[in-house]
Amino acid sequence: DSGSVARTERVVPMIAIARAMGASFTIRQNAYLVGGLLGMSPEELTEKLPSIIEFADLGNYLDRHLRGAPTSARQRLAWSIAMAIDADVYAIDQTLVVGELEFRQKCWSAVDTLRENGATFIVSSDGAKQYRRFCDRGLYFEQGALVADTTVPRALALAREARREPRGE
């Protein structure tokens, strides 16, 4: 079987976007690179760059190479760019909200605001805490087939049960 899905919403794939950055590029160059990959125009990036850099707290590093910036700079910049995009859906992974406590709190606040404004988050994570934080609906799949469209706690319970059951031959 095959098929397709047509979406009119703007989707921001935040999964592994920080890996696209180049260590020999400056923070500014990486912002344009990643923003462009996520669908932002150069004009949109130029307009939003000050708020992106402020959110990421990377103002002192703007024209430095990424390799000379703090180790968390890559993730902070990626997160800040994604949050600057006016999207309907954000697909994120478990490694996205990293870094210092103050930055993580800023990220969670941004997520809460986006959710209050109707944004949808598709989350891929090994940790139940991430699902509880982002999701109010749980989809549980087995071998590519939807088994349950339920609450997050119930979907997590199904996943735990499946891991405990012996695998068939």
Regions found by a protein language model. Give the residues of each.
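Conserved ABC ATPase "signature" region
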Residues: 32, 46-61, 80
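H-loop/switch region of ABC-family ATPase nucleotide-binding domains
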Residues: 125-126
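Conserved ABC ATPase "signature" C-loop
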Residues: 143-144
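Conserved catalytic segment of ABC-fold P-loop ATPases
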Residues: 133-140
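ABC ATPase nucleotide-binding domain signature region
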Residues: 1-36
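Helical segment within the ABC ATPase nucleotide-binding domain
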Residues: 104-117
